[in-house]
Curated annotation (Swiss-Prot):
Tissue expression from the record: Expressed by the venom duct.
Modified residues (D-leucine): L44
Name of this chain's protein: Iota-conotoxin-like R11.18
Gene Ontology CC: one annotated term: extracellular region
Disulfide-linked positions: C5-C19, C12-C22, C18-C27, C21-C38
Length: 46
């Protein structure tokens, strides 16, 4: 299921610890230094 995350609280279909949402709705862990909360890969929900 989608989970709210990011500053705007939009829904993300994929979840990661401390996730934020990108314009494309993908999530990334907060440890991403280059693009915080952004990733081209998807993190599947456990």
């Amino acid at each position: 299921g989608a989970v709210p995350c990011g500053k705007d609280g939009r829904q993300c279909r994929n979840h990661a610890d401390c996730c934020n949402c990108c314009p494309f709705g993908t999530c990334a862990p907060s440890t991403n230094r280059i693009l915080p909360g952004c990733s081209t890969g998807m993190f599947l929900t456990r």
